[in-house]
């Protein structure tokens, strides 16, 4: 018997004891082997282990293949385990958290194939110098990545591309000197970014993209305030409530914003968001700031006018089917220093037009030249019409010429006259040309017979010594109805068909212009062929201008009288309503209440009031019978209306209405709730 006991005791001593603590938390088995001096994975781990702690053990190296039997393992903690090598040659399909912080790892293997469900990776405070581009491949469910306290100097540009669901990124306390462009691209759910304690001097333009980033830590970097920092300075101004100062042991949500913590190292230690970069090129000077567009796209930029569209119409007055050339409606932004225009490939000539802010521009036979330059003639259009060689025309329709109004006349409707142009016959040896400025010379059409140059489409050029230049009208010119008398030509000449250039303005939208009547900037627009009929265009323009001038509603006197009339009618109506209300109140005060009241009926209800009995409270404890009954008598006056007049003669208020009865009824109601009245 004693021998058997000794054998059992010896067998127990030979069997190794399981030194880890096993507990169950929220239906998950948790095994705690922290600080047990383990150099290898302890045997006898429960197969349903979900949380395994192996921190503060001198493991040296670790392989996930040892955890193959633990199919339910969700968390693995290897903090401060003196790891120098981590192998992921065994697949853990349910592992969500891997903590290898405070070790001696110099590189990280590719984790996506062995740990497809990983959501949190903590590799802080190791000796990582660089990361391979495929380190995070396959970690599509990764939410938190902690790489703080390493020796990283650069990062692969596409390192975070596989982690589209990343929410927290900690790169603090490294040796990063630059960040790759597009590093945060595709991280739409990123809300916390730690970049403090690095060697960053600037960030690439467009680095933050359109991310919201509610919690950002950028302090502790030697930010160099020069022209390259303007992007970060503007981003800090636009997101001043999202920049925080990190404190040890304090959650990001528990801290307060501190945008002043991001400071320049070379500019008197001022906050970066206050740096304006006065000597740096601005977008208006051709510099590319590449700012993120946080505002609306239609926001007005300084010094930029709103886009406008114009159309140039060119048609022939010689043929019945008029050919029209419409300009491409390209929007143009006019800057203070220069102008930009989008030209068509078929464009042969452009003319600087003066745009007026009118919703429907009238059809003008010509454009008003600028006051500083002499009147010029237009160059020929891309599709000039040629005269018919078989039948020489007998008459030539001249071009219309608007006459400059007299200085004493107000800028009202002008009735211009027409100046017939009679081409003079020329000899074959000479070819006359129309005098034009040196900037826009006109080439006459060559012909074997004596020809005449094309008449200009602008107003006829007067002699410089007798006629001054035509000044620019202060108001948009309207299209008058020209009268065009025929002109008989010499039989020896063959006139060419003149061309007339009209300008049809489309609906223009001008943003940021204080007065709609002020002229806008000038820009150049191309010409593209189209079709239009000259007589119809003249009739539409003339009818529009005549109807707008002759309509009664557009009379300025009538427009001013209408509000005044409505104002007077409102005062009269208010006065009438006040008088009616005063009369009603006066009549109501003089009417006697007795006249309005109906007949009064009085009904007497008498209730017998029993004898009042006083019973001490002590007796009630021993009283086995029923409680005494109390009765009250009330006098009710029933009337046809709610009006209660004075008491009639011979009646006085009873004691019940003076307070005693009210106290009595209240006492009865409280003490004896079964009593009813």
Swiss-Prot record:
<dbReference type="InterPro" id="IPR001611">
    <property type="entry name" value="Leu-rich_rpt"/>
</dbReference>
<feature type="glycosylation site" description="O-linked (GalNAc...) serine">
    <location>
        <position position="497"/>
    </location>
</feature>
<feature type="glycosylation site" description="O-linked (GalNAc...) serine">
    <location>
        <position position="523"/>
    </location>
</feature>
<feature type="site" description="Cleavage; by ADAM17">
    <location>
        <begin position="539"/>
        <end position="540"/>
    </location>
</feature>
<feature type="compositionally biased region" description="Low complexity">
    <location>
        <begin position="427"/>
        <end position="470"/>
    </location>
</feature>
<keyword id="KW-0732">Signal</keyword>
<dbReference type="InterPro" id="IPR003591">
    <property type="entry name" value="Leu-rich_rpt_typical-subtyp"/>
</dbReference>
<keyword id="KW-1015">Disulfide bond</keyword>
<feature type="modified residue" description="Phosphoserine">
    <location>
        <position position="657"/>
    </location>
</feature>
<protein>
    <recommendedName>
        <fullName>Platelet glycoprotein Ib alpha chain</fullName>
    </recommendedName>
</protein>
<keyword id="KW-0812">Transmembrane</keyword>
<feature type="modified residue" description="Sulfotyrosine">
    <location>
        <position position="294"/>
    </location>
</feature>
<feature type="compositionally biased region" description="Low complexity">
    <location>
        <begin position="393"/>
        <end position="403"/>
    </location>
</feature>
<keyword id="KW-0325">Glycoprotein</keyword>
<keyword id="KW-0597">Phosphoprotein</keyword>
<dbReference type="InterPro" id="IPR000372">
    <property type="entry name" value="LRRNT"/>
</dbReference>
<feature type="disulfide bond">
    <location>
        <begin position="20"/>
        <end position="33"/>
    </location>
</feature>
<keyword id="KW-0356">Hemostasis</keyword>
<dbReference type="GO" id="GO:0007596">
    <property type="term" value="P:blood coagulation"/>
</dbReference>
<feature type="disulfide bond">
    <location>
        <begin position="227"/>
        <end position="280"/>
    </location>
</feature>
<feature type="transmembrane region" description="Helical">
    <location>
        <begin position="565"/>
        <end position="585"/>
    </location>
</feature>
<feature type="domain" description="LRRNT">
    <location>
        <begin position="17"/>
        <end position="47"/>
    </location>
</feature>
<dbReference type="InterPro" id="IPR032675">
    <property type="entry name" value="LRR_dom_sf"/>
</dbReference>
<comment type="function">
    <text>GP-Ib, a surface membrane protein of platelets, participates in the formation of platelet plugs by binding to the A1 domain of vWF, which is already bound to the subendothelium.</text>
</comment>
<feature type="compositionally biased region" description="Low complexity">
    <location>
        <begin position="362"/>
        <end position="385"/>
    </location>
</feature>
<keyword id="KW-0472">Membrane</keyword>
<feature type="glycosylation site" description="O-linked (GalNAc...) threonine">
    <location>
        <position position="372"/>
    </location>
</feature>
<keyword id="KW-0433">Leucine-rich repeat</keyword>
<feature type="repeat" description="LRR 1">
    <location>
        <begin position="72"/>
        <end position="93"/>
    </location>
</feature>
<feature type="glycosylation site" description="O-linked (GalNAc...) threonine">
    <location>
        <position position="346"/>
    </location>
</feature>
<keyword id="KW-1133">Transmembrane helix</keyword>
<feature type="glycosylation site" description="O-linked (GalNAc...) threonine">
    <location>
        <position position="399"/>
    </location>
</feature>
<comment type="subunit">
    <text>Two GP-Ib beta are disulfide-linked to one GP-Ib alpha. GP-IX is complexed with the GP-Ib heterodimer via a non covalent linkage. Interacts with FLNB. Interacts with FLNA (via filamin repeats 4, 9, 12, 17, 19, 21, and 23).</text>
</comment>
<keyword id="KW-0130">Cell adhesion</keyword>
<feature type="region of interest" description="Disordered">
    <location>
        <begin position="359"/>
        <end position="499"/>
    </location>
</feature>
<keyword id="KW-0677">Repeat</keyword>
<feature type="glycosylation site" description="O-linked (GalNAc...) threonine">
    <location>
        <position position="324"/>
    </location>
</feature>
<feature type="glycosylation site" description="O-linked (GalNAc...) threonine">
    <location>
        <position position="487"/>
    </location>
</feature>
<feature type="topological domain" description="Extracellular">
    <location>
        <begin position="17"/>
        <end position="564"/>
    </location>
</feature>
<dbReference type="GO" id="GO:0007155">
    <property type="term" value="P:cell adhesion"/>
</dbReference>
<feature type="glycosylation site" description="O-linked (GalNAc...) threonine">
    <location>
        <position position="368"/>
    </location>
</feature>
<feature type="repeat" description="LRR 6">
    <location>
        <begin position="189"/>
        <end position="210"/>
    </location>
</feature>
């Amino acid at each position: 018997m004693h021998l058997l006991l000794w054998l059992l005791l010896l067998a127990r001593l030979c069997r190794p004891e399981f030194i880890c603590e096993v507990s169950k938390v929220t239906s998950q088995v948790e095994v705690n082997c922290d600080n047990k001096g383990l150099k290898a994975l302890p045997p006898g781990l429960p197969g349903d282990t979900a949380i395994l702690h192996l921190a503060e053990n001198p493991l040296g190296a670790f392989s996930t293949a040892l955890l193959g039997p633990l199919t339910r393992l969700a968390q693995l903690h290897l903090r401060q385990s003196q790891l120098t090598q981590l192998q992921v040659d065994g697949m853990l399909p349910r592992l969500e958290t891997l903590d290898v912080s405070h070790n001696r790892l110099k590189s990280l293997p590719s984790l996506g194939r062995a740990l497809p469900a990983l959501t949190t990776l903590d590799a802080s405070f190791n000796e990582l110098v660089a990361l391979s581009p495929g380190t995070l491949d396959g970690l599509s469910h990764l939410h938190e990545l902690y790489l703080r306290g390493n020796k990283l100097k650069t990062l692969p540009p596409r390192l975070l591309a596989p982690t589209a669901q990343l929410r927290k990124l900690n790169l603090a306390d490294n040796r990063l000197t630059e960040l790759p462009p597009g590093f945060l691209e595709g991280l739409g759910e990123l809300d916390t970014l730690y970049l403090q304690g690095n060697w960053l001097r600037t960030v690439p333009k467009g680095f933050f993209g359109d991310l919201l980033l509610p919690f950002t830590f950028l302090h502790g970097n030697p930010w160099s305030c020069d022209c390259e920092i303007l992007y970060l300075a503007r981003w800090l101004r636009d997101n001043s409530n999202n920049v925080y100062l990190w404190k040890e042991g304090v959650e990001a949500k528990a801290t307060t914003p501190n945008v002043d913590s991001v400071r320049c190292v070379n500019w008197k230690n001022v906050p970066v968001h206050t740096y304006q970069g006065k000597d740096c090129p601005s977008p208006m000077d051709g510099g590319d700031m590449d700012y993120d567009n946080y505002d609306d796209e239609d926001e007005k930029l300084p010094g930029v006018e709103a886009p406008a569209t114009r159309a140039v119409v060119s048609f022939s007055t010689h043929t019945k089917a008029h050919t029209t050339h419409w300009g491409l409606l390209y929007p143009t932004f006019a800057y203070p220093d220069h102008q930009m225009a989008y030209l068509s490939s078929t464009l042969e000539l452009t003319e600087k037009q003066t745009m007026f802010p009118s919703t429907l521009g009238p059809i003008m036979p010509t454009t008003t030249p600028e006051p500083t330059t002499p009147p010029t003639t237009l160059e020929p259009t891309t599709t000039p019409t040629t005269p018919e060689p078989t039948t020489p025309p007998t008459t030539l329709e001249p071009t219309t010429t608007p006459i400059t109004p007299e200085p004493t006349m107000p800028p009202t409707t002008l009735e211009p006259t027409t100046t017939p142009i009679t081409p003079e016959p020329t000899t074959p040896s000479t070819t006359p040309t129309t005098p034009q400025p040196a900037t826009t010379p006109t080439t006459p059409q060559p012909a074997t017979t004596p020809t005449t140059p094309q008449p200009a489409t602008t107003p006829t050029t007067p002699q410089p010594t007798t006629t001054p230049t035509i000044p620019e009208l202060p108001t948009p010119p309207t299209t008058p109805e020209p009268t065009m008398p025929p002109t008989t030509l010499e039989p020896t000449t063959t006139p060419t068909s003149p061309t007339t250039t009209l300008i049809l303005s489309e609906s223009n939208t001008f943003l940021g212009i204080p007065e709609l009547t002020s002229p806008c900037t000038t820009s150049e627009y191309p010409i593209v062929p189209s079709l239009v009929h000259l007589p119809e265009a003249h009739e539409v323009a003339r009818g529009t201008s005549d109807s707008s001038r002759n309509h009664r509603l557009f009379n300025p006197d009538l427009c001013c009288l209408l509000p005044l009339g409505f104002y007077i009618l409102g005062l009269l109506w208010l006065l009438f309503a006040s008088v009616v209300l005063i009369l009603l109140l006066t009549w109501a005060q003089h009417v006697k209440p007795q006249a309005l009241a109906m007949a009064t009926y009085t009904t007497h209800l008498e209730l017998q009031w029993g004898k009042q009995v006083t019973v001490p409270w002590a007796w009630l404890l021993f009283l086995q019978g029923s409680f005494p009954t109390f009765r009250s008598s009330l006098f009710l006056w029933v009337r046809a209306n709610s009006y209660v007049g004075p008491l009639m003669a011979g009646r006085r208020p009873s004691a019940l209405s003076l307070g005693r009865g009210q106290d009595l009824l209240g006492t009865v109601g409280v003490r004896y709730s079964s009593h009813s009245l």
